[in-house]
């Protein structure tokens, strides 16, 4: 109800407002509306009712509860379809908000008329079922209708007010717009209740006229049940099905009903009744009437629901709307629940054969022809019972008269079951033949039944079943309930306008359109789309002849409707209809096959059917056997004689046999003689015999005759209460008592069967006919008098005290006319009987005008009743609710109902009354083409020149619609009078307008006629002017026809001399009119008649520009072919291409460019086509233009570039496209992006991507600038929905910055950035990892350990974190002990480190760097090589994280692990998501980021060869102290970018990201290793030897923990000449290392820095299996790298490694390493493990703490898994990689934002606002002199390297990095490692940085390798004492190389390399070996930790 009320508010408001004119008019207050249908109905006369329910057409129908003034209630005809929708939506929302409370709304006020309880219940019910009854219309009358079954609602039997007001009956809903589900539901509930109390109330009833008796008794239960049943079960259909709970409430709800007379009745027999849809309420009611079978009977799905009566407000969040269509509930009294079905198999077989035949003339349907009682209905019902609607048979079949509903067996079978063939001895069935044939016939029947999707029974005594609107509505309702057509049901739910099209209201207005558009077209479309089964479907229609009894004066009967529609039926939708033999002519227009059931002589099968039935009856009843056996026994002879006698008498009538056997069974007929004389000879005699037995005396029949008269006269079944009141309405005194009435009714119970809705229906139509009419010669005994019945019904209506509703008024008129009681009085009284009848009706009701204008009476008018209404005083100029509130005359003129128009004109209707649109009846008739009505109206002096509100006269309307005859007539009419009066509008104007109208619509005949008008008088009649424009539209005939594409008219006009260049009023010539619409054929015609193809309009536009602007490709091509100039400009300087771009027509743009249009043309404002395309926002057009040479950085005169325009217009796809194409982000871009979060994300992501790219190339400084610039541009507020995305992006930027800072030896800043990231994302293990790395680099081991422990908690499985943790723990231990001399060098591994330890710290560092560089490089190379294949596979690595190195990557989807732990696959091609490479999260978080990000970020960059790399080897020479400032050749840039040598492998990050890239890390490595190896010093030592200076070996001192060694930057000169000796000898004990580092720091600040740089730069220089410089296989190195210790050899123990490494790491060296690794090893490297196992293995191998952090986790490993293990996360990598990662992962994001090429270091620093100096000092306390340099950007330049910044080496970044890698030192390698860790590692996944994993991984891997190599392989002494120079130097080199090598390789290496890094030599060898191994092992790191971090 709530919903109803809502609907009322919505609709009601509208409709009722509009309709208010009809009924009481007042709209209900909202609450009332809410109240429910009930309330509506009950509401006093509220039109609202009608409004509310969908069905109600007019409030008229609505049962106005209280007297309402006429005029108010009419509703608009067409309910806005949206009401339901709106109501549903609102209700849904309210339901969600209020939950169950909604139902609790106090119904009290709502139903003021009812008792509170009842009200509430009904309210609930109603609330629940908002559908209007109309929809649900059942076959029964509305509750308020006198005939309605529904109990009246009024409590008081006599209550006058209540009369209709309280009725909840669906009827009232009828009025409502929809079908009235609501009412229906309501009624159901009421009915249920009523039924419940029916018994009691009946007892209470007094005999008097008290209504109460009938009220309560009135089948409350039945209707309720029925309703409930149907609705609840079967009808889950109802819009809001009633929740079961309603049931209960309903039951309790209203026991009392309204007086019958108060109930609305259906239309008149003619069916013309105007009853509102309300009228349908009857139907509704019937539809929902309770089943007589009792609630217990299993109903469709009703079962359990019913029982729970707490249905109450379970509608909690309010049920979503259900279908608002309600099927009629049919009940066929002749078919009882005990009926059996015998024979007829041949019929089904024949039907099946005909429907399947290929003969189109007969396969569309079958007509079953037979006389009354021959079993037609039984055949239909048998198919229904076996069909999907079989459960409804329980409603259709009546209970047997003997069975009381209470005792119905719930489980009993459906009616019409076939009897068991137990009596096969006598039963031959109808099957002539064998069991096989019988089986086939049985199959045919079942096959037919399975195809049945809808059915309809026409019943003459239930008028609604005979009306076309109900037929259409019912069929649609059943179709959508058919399981085979669920797609149709879904479509109706999806498209509410279809439901509104099928609402009863729409069906009344235009049943053909409703059926065609609501049923046939949707089904046809669904069938074409293969959404419904590809099989035949069948609709069954029984009793077409019955519908003819209610044929309307205007409109179709069901059979004529089908005859018109059958041509539109799809071939797979078949009909099976039945018709009586006497009326079979009505079906002659149906192209169906006919089957006759009454040709007994011709068809042996009929005889066998009869025989089988006789056998069945005799064998199933011992009584029959006893009564027909002559001597107590039955022999075959007797049987044969009897059966042949009965068959002969029956002539084929099953009904005759059934009734005869019933008489025999009951003993009324005893056949003791063989003459069988006692057997009645016909059906008529059977009825006579029955009546004689029932009414032995005439007086006994006279007692019941009035009841029969009323039943016969009624239009629909009446309840006992209604009949009782009607009987008493005929007597003034001495009324019949209720008990007496009940006795009489009991006597009639065998003839008037009580239906489930408690109404009474004749047992069979033939009995009803027998009571009314007899054939000649038949006895007239028991003949009834229908006139008397009509009289009683008319009196009953007249004596009702409340106001009758429209439907009842129409019925009253019908009964008055049929009663004709004044016949013969006119002469006596002197007054015409028609006047007296008019007085009668006028005294009986007030709503005459509303009744006259009711929807049904408008569309299917009853002329006689309408005349009576007019005589009674109805307003003939009454405004209806249709056609813009047009007067009745307008509507009838529009519909073409000549008799009604004549009637209205006869009574003086205003001939010029207009609707709200200004149209008069003449205009409507002319527009519809009804010449006869036009003539009638013109005779009544209708104004010919009347203009409607659009300025159109009747002549124009006729011309617009092509009605030539009407045009001719109107032109010949007399216009003089009107013309003179108006003075303005003349006939000539009208003719000119008519010419234009006809030309525009293509009516050549009218155009020709108007041009050839005879000119009788030049002055008065002007012929139409062919070149003039009209005064209405301002068009000439040619411009109008050309613009509408009317080719024939254009030809005609040109032939008649129309000027081809004649413009219309707006100055447009025909050529432009037609070009604008794209009619190239007419363009051709005009050009052939001399039009200029390059003609320009006022704005200078040519036809080509117009066509391009409108996107008409065909016309553009045609014009170009005709020589149109492509270079012409309009007045603004725009060309055709400019226009096409401005409107985004790609196909036209392509065509114009292909034809030579200039893509760089600038208009007068300097805007190129690209500017205009960017403004429009079509990315494809932009892409096309850029690909075809458009200047992407073109600036127009207002200083705007295409990118700025796209940003300003928020065209994200264009922004992404332009950024991908290299557009620069300038100040204007940022300004335009303000307050556009989606654009900001794209731009920031682009910056990030650029930073990642620089980082990958090792240009850490540039990368830092980018990140800092991005942070600077970060919006300060207003993130809105994108808050999470921005936060993730910022975290990634901060982590990336931290990584870069660390690589730049600005440890303080690095730490601060990581801390800021933690503030934003406290649970970020990547941030902890990054901070730990920064702290470790600045030798705050304890603090680093703390952060690592936090990280490992957050991500326990992260190997990088575990590795680093081990190292840091080891370093802490080492710091605590005085520096211990490094363990004796292990074979070769340690030797290099130890050998040189003391000689020179610097040297050592350099050596280390060299080693690391070479080994790393080699490893990287090797790894890359190995990786190449595996890189793609790497499971864990989020590929996405690194920007694609090469274009191929773009295509490949990158997978990145999301921080959440889920992997995301990014297709870089797709431009939808923008994630920073670093963070997956980004991508996932904000797909908004924009495709651009993905694409551009990930777009692989072409491989670059960095000069350094190109050189065969890198020459690392530690720069002098100041060297740090110098830029070292970086290891090969990202593999992609590298020269062929380096191309082999991208950094691991990239690798992972780019697995698909052509430049695979492997290849890169291979090339690198191949080319470099030869050139490289054979061993890092040799490189060191080459270095210009070597650090003197400092005494080994315990490194001070507090002291942060600033890595000395060793200038590693990659020389082609190996210096093995030096390298090998350089091994510095740990202590020495520390000291050296310290002293070096002070001595060589810059050199340390340099060293650091080189160290970090260490590239995995794995040769593919090559030997490291000194000849050792790179594999080992690679392995160690992977493991995280680049130089560690297997020989080295983990502990050793850790010690050395830890000091080394702590030392400046370490820092340097980090950068190197970071760069080359993206997180992807480390993480890249083929499997977790690999990672684990590698981690174990790496062993060193550093390694641990480096340890790759399989990137593929689930981030979730990783997450669980906090240790896994590699915070180190994380910080950097995160940043980087972020960019890679949100590839698009990073790429998208292009940082300004130059970032000032200061600016980047500023962004973070972290004091560099403090950071430096902190990090480089020990190296104080150096630290400033390192920390300071000034020295940074030197180290700008490929190092991935913060591990952010997006693929792109990496790719780009690589090229730089060669050039730059790998200082960033370490940071890469870090990077790797953070985002890449799965643990990190959660963080957005996880996106970057690939790059991070590689970085990490490098880093790890580097660290491992440096720390592990180099002696710790070396590390420390040289200040890590060695590490930085040799290792750095190695690392650098590693980093340079593809990240993947690094990762692999990391995995594969042993942790032992003790000796550089070993390391180198290992590296070379490892690199080989790396190559060998797929580098698909699963998602190395780094990767995930990244």
From Swiss-Prot:
Result, substituting residue 794 to V: In IDDALDS; uncertain significance
Biological process (GO), any one: regulation of dendritic spine morphogenesis
Swiss-Prot/TrEMBL TPR repeat ranges: 1244-1277, 1291-1324, 1325-1358
List of glycosylated residues: 1928
ANK repeats by residue range: 846-878, 884-913, 917-946, 950-979, 990-1019, 1033-1062, 1066-1095, 1099-1128, 1132-1161, 1165-1194, 1198-1227
Residue ranges with Low complexity bias: 1783-1798
Result for mutant: residue 961 to Q: In IDDALDS; uncertain significance
Subcellular location: Cell projection, Dendritic spine
SUPFAM superfamilies in alphabetical order: Ankyrin repeat (SSF48403), P-loop containing nucleoside triphosphate hydrolases (SSF52540), TPR-like (SSF48452)
Signal peptide range in chain numbering: none
Biased composition (Polar residues): 419-431, 1469-1498, 1553-1572
Family: Belongs to the TANC family.
Residues with PTM Phosphoserine: 169, 238, 294, 400, 1442, 1458, 1530, 1545, 1579, 1722, 1824, 1827
Asymmetric dimethylarginine found at: 1563, 1576
Region (Disordered): 1-85, 129-149, 396-442, 1372-1401, 1430-1586, 1692-1718, 1783-1803, 1821-1843, 1968-1990
Protein name: Protein TANC2
GO cellular component: axon; dendritic spine
Function according to Swiss-Prot or TrEMBL: Scaffolding protein in the dendritic spines which acts as immobile postsynaptic posts able to recruit KIF1A-driven dense core vesicles to dendritic spines.
Reported impact of residue 755 to H: In IDDALDS; uncertain significance
Assembly notes: Interacts with KIF1A; the interaction decreases in presence of calcium.
Annotated consequence of substituting residue 760 to C: In IDDALDS; reduced interaction with KIF1A; impaired neuronal dense core vesicles transport; no effect on dendritic spine location
Entry superkingdom: Eukaryota
InterPro entries in the cross-refs: Ankyrin_rpt, Ankyrin_rpt-contain_sf, Dendritic_Spine_Reg/Scaffold, P-loop_NTPase, TPR-like_helical_dom_sf, TPR_rpt
Entry keyword set: ANK repeat, Autism spectrum disorder, Cell projection, Disease variant, Glycoprotein, Intellectual disability, Methylation, Phosphoprotein, Repeat, Synapse, TPR repeat
Disease per record: Intellectual developmental disorder with autistic features and language delay, with or without seizures: An autosomal dominant neurodevelopmental disorder characterized by global developmental delay, varying degrees of intellectual disability, autism spectrum disorder, and delayed language. Some patients develop seizures.
């Amino acid at each position: 109800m709530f919903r109803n009320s809502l609907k009322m508010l919505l609709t009601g408001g509208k409709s009722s407002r509009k309709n208010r004119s009809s009924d009481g008019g007042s709209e209900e207050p909202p609450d009332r509306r809410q109240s429910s249908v009930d309330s509506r109905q009950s509401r006093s006369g509220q039109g609202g009712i009608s409004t509310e329910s969908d069905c109600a057409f007019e409030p008229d129908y609505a049962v106005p509860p209280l007297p309402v003034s006429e005029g108010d209630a009419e509703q608009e005809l067409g309910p806005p379809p949206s009401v339901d929708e709106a109501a549903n939506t609102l209700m849904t929302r309210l339901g969600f908000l209020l939950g169950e409370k909604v139902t609790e709304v106090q119904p009290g006020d709502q139903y003021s008329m009812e008792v509170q309880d009842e009200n509430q219940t009904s309210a609930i019910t109603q609330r629940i079922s908002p559908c209007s009854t109309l929809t649900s219309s059942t076959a029964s009358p509305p509750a308020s209708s006198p005939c309605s079954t529904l109990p009246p609602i009024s409590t008081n039997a006599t209550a006058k007010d209540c009369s209709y007001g309280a009725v909840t009956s669906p009827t009232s809903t009828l009025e409502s717009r929809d079908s009235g589900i609501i009412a229906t539901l309501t009624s159901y509930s009421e009915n249920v209740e009523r039924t419940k109390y029916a018994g009691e109330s009946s007892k209470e009833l007094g005999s008097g006229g008290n209504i109460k008796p009938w009220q309560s008794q009135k089948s409350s239960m039945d209707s309720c049940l029925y309703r409930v049943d149907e609705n609840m079960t079967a009808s889950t259909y109802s819009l809001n099905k009633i929740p079961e709970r309603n049931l209960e409430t309903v039951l309790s709800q209203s026991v009392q009903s309204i007086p019958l007379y108060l109930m609305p009745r259906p239309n008149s027999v003619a069916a013309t009744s105007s009853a509102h849809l309300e009228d349908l309420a009857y139907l509704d009611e019937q539809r929902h009437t309770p089943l007589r079978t009792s609630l217990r009977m299993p109903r469709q799905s009703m079962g359990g629901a019913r029982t729970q009566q707490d249905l109450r407000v379970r509608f909690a969040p309010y049920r979503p709307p259900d279908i608002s269509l309600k099927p009629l509930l049919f009940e066929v009294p002749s078919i009882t629940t005990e009926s059996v079905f015998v024979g007829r198999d041949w019929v089904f077989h024949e039907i099946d054969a005909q429907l399947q035949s290929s003969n189109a003339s007969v396969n569309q349907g079958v007509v079953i022809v037979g006389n009354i009682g021959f079993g037609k209905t039984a055949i239909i019902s048998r198919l229904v019972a076996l069909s999907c609607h079989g459960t409804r048979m329980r409603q259709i079949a009546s209970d047997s008269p003997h069975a009381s509903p209470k005792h119905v067996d719930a489980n009993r079978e459906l009616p019409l079951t076939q009897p068991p063939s137990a009596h096969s001895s006598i039963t031959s069935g109808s099957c002539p033949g064998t069991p096989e044939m019988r089986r086939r016939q049985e199959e045919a029947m079942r096959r037919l039944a399975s195809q049945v999707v809808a059915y309809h029974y026409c019943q003459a005594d239930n008028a609604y079943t005979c009306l076309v609107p109900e037929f259409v509505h019912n069929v649609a309702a059943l179709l959508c309930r058919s399981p085979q057509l669920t797609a149709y049901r879904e479509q109706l739910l999806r498209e509410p306008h279809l439901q509104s099209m099928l609402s009863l209201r729409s069906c009344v207005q235009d049943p053909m359109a409703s059926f065609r558009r609501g049923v046939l077209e949707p089904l046809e479309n669904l069938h074409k789309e293969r959404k419904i089964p590809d099989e035949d479907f069948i609709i069954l229609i029984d009793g077409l002849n019955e519908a003819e009894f209610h044929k309307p004066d205007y409109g179709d009967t069901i059979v004529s409707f089908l005859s018109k529609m059958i041509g539109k039926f799809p071939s797979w939708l078949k009909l099976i209809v039945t018709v009586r033999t006497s009326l079979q002519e009505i079906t002659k227009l149906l192209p169906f096959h006919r089957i006759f059931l009454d040709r007994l002589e011709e068809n042996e099968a009929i005889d066998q059917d009869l025989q089988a039935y006789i056998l069945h009856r005799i064998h199933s009843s011992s009584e029959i056997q006893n009564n027909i056996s002559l001597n107590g026994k039955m022999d075959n002879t007797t049987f044969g004689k009897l059966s042949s006698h009965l068959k002969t008498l029956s002539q084929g009538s099953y009904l005759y046999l059934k009734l005869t056997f019933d008489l025999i069974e009951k003993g009324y007929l005893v056949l003791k003689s063989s003459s069988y004389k006692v057997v009645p000879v016909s059906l008529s005699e059977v009825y006579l015999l029955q009546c004689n037995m029932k009414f032995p005396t005439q007086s006994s029949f006279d007692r019941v005759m009035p009841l029969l008269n009323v039943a016969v006269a009624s239009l629909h079944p009446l309840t006992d209460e209604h009949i009782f009141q009607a009987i008493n309405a005929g007597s003034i005194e001495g009324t019949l008592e209720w008990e007496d009435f009940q006795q009489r009714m009991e006597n009639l119970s065998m003839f008037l069967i009580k239906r489930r809705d408690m109404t009474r229906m004749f047992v069979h139509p033939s009995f009803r006919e027998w009571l009314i009419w007899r054939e000649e010669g038949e006895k007239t005994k028991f003949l009834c008098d229908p006139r008397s019945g009509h009289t009683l019904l008319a009196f009953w209506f007249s004596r009702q005290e409340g106001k009758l509703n429209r439907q009842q008024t129409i019925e009253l008129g019908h009964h008055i006319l049929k009663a004709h009681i004044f016949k013969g009085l006119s002469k006596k009284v002197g007054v015409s009987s028609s006047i007296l009848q008019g007085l009668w009706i006028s005294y009986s009701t007030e709503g005459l005008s509303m009744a006259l204008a009711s929807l049904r009476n408008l569309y299917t008018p009853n002329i006689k009743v309408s005349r009576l209404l007019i005589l009674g005083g109805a307003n003939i100029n009454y405004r209806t609710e249709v056609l813009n509130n047009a007067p009745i005359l307008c509507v009838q003129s529009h519909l073409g109902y000549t008799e009604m128009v004549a009637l209205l004109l006869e009574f003086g209707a205003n001939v010029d009354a207009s609707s709200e649109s200004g149209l008069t009846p003449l205009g409507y008739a002319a527009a519809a083409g009804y010449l006869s009505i036009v003539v009638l109206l013109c005779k009544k002096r209708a104004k010919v020149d009347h203009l409607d509100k659009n300025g159109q006269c009747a002549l124009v309307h006729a011309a617009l619609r092509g009605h030539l005859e009407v045009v001719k007539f109107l032109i010949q009419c007399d216009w003089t009078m009107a013309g003179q009066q108006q003075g303005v509008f003349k006939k000539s104007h009208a003719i000119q307008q008519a010419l234009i109208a006809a030309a525009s619509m293509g009516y050549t005949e009218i155009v020709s006629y108007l041009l050839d008008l005879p000119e009788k008088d030049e002055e008065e009649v002007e012929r139409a002017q062919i070149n003039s424009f009209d005064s209405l539209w301002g068009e000439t005939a040619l411009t109008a026809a050309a613009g509408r594409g009317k080719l024939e008219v254009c030809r005609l006009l040109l032939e008649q001399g129309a000027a081809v260049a004649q413009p219309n009023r707006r100055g447009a010539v025909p050529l432009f009119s037609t070009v604008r619409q794209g009619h190239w054929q007419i363009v051709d015609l005009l050009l052939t008649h001399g039009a200029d193809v390059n003609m320009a309009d006022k704005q200078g536009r040519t036809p080509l520009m117009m066509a391009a602007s409108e996107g008409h490709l065909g016309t553009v091509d045609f014009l170009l072919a005709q020589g149109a100039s492509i270079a012409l400009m309009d007045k603004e300087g725009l060309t055709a291409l400019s226009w096409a771009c401005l409107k985004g027509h790609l196909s036209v743009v392509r065509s114009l460019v292909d034809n030579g249009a200039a893509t760089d043309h600038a208009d007068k404002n300097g805007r190129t086509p690209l500017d205009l395309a960017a403004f429009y926002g079509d990315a494809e057009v932009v892409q096309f233009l850029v690909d075809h040479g458009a200047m992407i950085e073109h600036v127009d005169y207002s200083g705007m570039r295409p990118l700025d325009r796209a940003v300003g217009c928020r065209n994200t796809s264009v922004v992404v496209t332009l950024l991908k194409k290299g557009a620069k982000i300038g100040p204007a871009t940022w300004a335009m992006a303000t307050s556009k979060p989606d654009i900001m994300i794209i731009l920031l992501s682009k910056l990030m991507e650029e930073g990642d790219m620089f980082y990958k190339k090792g240009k850490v400084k540039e990368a830092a600038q980018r990140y800092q610039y991005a942070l600077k541009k970060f919006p300060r507020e207003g993130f809105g929905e994108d808050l999470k995305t921005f936060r993730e992006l910022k975290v990634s930027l901060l982590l990336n910055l931290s990584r870069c800072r660390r690589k730049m030896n600005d440890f303080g800043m690095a730490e601060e950035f990581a801390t800021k990231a933690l503030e934003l994302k406290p649970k970020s293990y990547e941030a902890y990892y990054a901070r730990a790395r920064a702290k470790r680099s600045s030798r705050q081991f304890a603090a680093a350990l703390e952060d690592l422990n936090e990280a490992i908690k957050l991500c326990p499985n992260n190997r990088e974190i575990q590795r680093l943790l081990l190292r840091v723990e080891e370093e802490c231990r080492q710091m605590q002990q005085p520096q211990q001399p490094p363990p004796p060098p292990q074979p070769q591994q340690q030797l290099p480190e130890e050998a040189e330890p003391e000689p020179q710290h610097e040297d050592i560092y350099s050596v280390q760097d060299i080693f690391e560089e070479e080994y790393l490089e080699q490893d990287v190379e090797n790894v890359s090589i190995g990786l190449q294949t595996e890189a793609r596979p790497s499971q864990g690595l989020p590929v996405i994280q690194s920007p694609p190195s090469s274009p191929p990557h773009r295509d490949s989807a990158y997978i990145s692990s999301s921080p959440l732990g889920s992997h995301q696959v990014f297709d870089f091609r797709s431009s939808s998501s923008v994630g920073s490479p670093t963070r997956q999260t980004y991508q996932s978080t904000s797909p908004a980021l924009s495709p651009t990000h993905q694409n551009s970020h990930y777009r692989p960059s072409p491989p670059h060869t960095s000069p350094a790399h190109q050189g065969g080897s890198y020459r690392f020479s530690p720069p002098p102290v100041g060297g740090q400032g110098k830029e070292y050749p970086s290891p090969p840039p990202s593999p992609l970018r590298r020269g062929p040598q380096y191309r082999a492998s991208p950094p691991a990050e990239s690798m992972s990201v780019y697995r698909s890239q052509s430049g695979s890390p492997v290849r890169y490595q291979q090339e690198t290793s191949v080319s470099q190896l030869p050139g490289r010093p054979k061993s890092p030592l040799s490189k060191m030897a080459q270095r210009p200076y070597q650090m003197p070996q400092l005494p080994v001192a315990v490194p001070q923990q507090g002291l942060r060694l600033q890595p000395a930057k060793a200038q590693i000169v990659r020389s082609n000449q190996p210096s093995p000796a030096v390298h090998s000898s350089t091994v510095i004990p740990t202590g020495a290392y520390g000291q050296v580092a310290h002293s070096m720091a002070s001595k060589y600040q810059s050199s340390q820095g340099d060293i650091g740089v080189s160290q970090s730069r260490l590239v995995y220089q794995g040769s593919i299996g090559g030997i490291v410089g000194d000849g050792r296989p790179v594999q080992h190195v690679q392995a160690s790298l992977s493991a995280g210790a680049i130089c560690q050899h297997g020989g080295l123990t983990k502990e050793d490694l850790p010690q050395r490494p830890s000091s080394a790491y702590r030392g400046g060296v370490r820092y340097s390493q980090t950068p190197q690794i970071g760069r080359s090893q993206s997180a992807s490297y480390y993480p890249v493990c083929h499997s977790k196992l690999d990672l684990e293995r590698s981690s174990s191998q790496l062993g060193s703490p550093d390694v641990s952090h480096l340890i790759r986790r399989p990137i593929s490993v689930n981030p979730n898994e990783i997450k669980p293990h906090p240790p896994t996360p590699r915070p180190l990598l994380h910080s950097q990689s995160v940043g980087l990662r972020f960019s890679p992962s949100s590839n698009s994001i990073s790429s998208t934002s292009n940082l300004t090429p130059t970032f000032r270091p200061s600016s980047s620093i500023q962004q973070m606002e972290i004091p560099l100096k403090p950071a430096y000092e902190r990090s480089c306390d020990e190296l104080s002199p150096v630290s400033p340099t390192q920390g300071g950007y000034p020295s940074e330049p030197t180290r700008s390297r490929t190092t991935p910044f913060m591990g952010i080496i997006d693929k792109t970044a990496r790719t780009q990095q690589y090229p730089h890698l060669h050039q730059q030192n790998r200082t960033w390698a370490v940071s890469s490692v870090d990077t790797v860790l953070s985002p890449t590692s799965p643990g990190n996944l959660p963080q957005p940085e996880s996106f970057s994993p690939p790059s991070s991984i590689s970085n990490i891997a490098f880093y790890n390798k580097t660290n491992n190599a440096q720390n592990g392989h180099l002696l710790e002494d070396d590390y420390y004492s040289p200040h890590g120079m060695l590490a930085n130097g040799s290792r750095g080199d190695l690392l650098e190389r590693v980093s340079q090598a593809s990240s993947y390789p690094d990762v692999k290496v990391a995995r594969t390399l042993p942790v032992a890094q003790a000796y550089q030599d070993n390391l180198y060898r290992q590296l070379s070996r490892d690199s080989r191994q790396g190559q060998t092992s797929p580098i698909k790191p699963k998602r190395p930790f780094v990767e995930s971090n990244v």
